[in-house]
């Protein structure tokens, strides 16, 4: 498992996430409230920004390659591939 640190409006939340569990699912298991809608990687409700680390987001279909390179992440379809730090609640910034 990897360490996940979420920078939320309520302050930082840290937890361990296995590499085969989506970050959103693991956060919910632990009672951390995060925004989501489709849970399938095809909308922007759960969008966040990767501050550091590596993710596998191959299951998502909403973000384009450029957005992924810029660090955008859909927490409902992201597996950790290293320890990660993610800013959450970023949908407005992504969709403007």
Curated annotation (Swiss-Prot):
InterPro entries (UniProt xref): 2Fe-2S_ferredoxin-like_sf, 2Fe-2S_ferredoxin-type, 2Fe2S_fd_BS, Beta-grasp_dom_sf, Fd_pln
Free-text remark on how the cofactor is bound: Binds 1 [2Fe-2S] cluster.
NCBIfam families linked: fdx_plant (TIGR02008)
Gene Ontology biological process: electron transport chain
Result for mutant: residue 6 to V: In 50% of the molecules
Protein name, as recorded: Ferredoxin
Family: Belongs to the 2Fe2S plant-type ferredoxin family.
Cofactor(s) named in the record: [2Fe-2S] cluster
Keywords linked to the UniProt accession: 2Fe-2S, Chloroplast, Electron transport, Iron, Iron-sulfur, Metal-binding, Plastid, Transport
Protein location: Plastid, Chloroplast
Any one annotated GO CC term: chloroplast stroma
Lineage: Eukaryota, Viridiplantae, Streptophyta, Embryophyta, Tracheophyta
Molecular functions per Gene Ontology: 2 iron, 2 sulfur cluster binding; electron transfer activity; metal ion binding
Function: Ferredoxins are iron-sulfur proteins that transfer electrons in a wide variety of metabolic reactions.
Domain 2Fe-2S ferredoxin-type: 2-92
PANTHER family attached to this UniProt entry: FERREDOXIN, FERREDOXIN-2, CHLOROPLASTIC
Recorded coiled-coil stretches: none
UniProt binding sites for [2Fe-2S] cluster: 38, 43, 46, 76
Impact upon substituting residue 12 to A: In 50% of the molecules
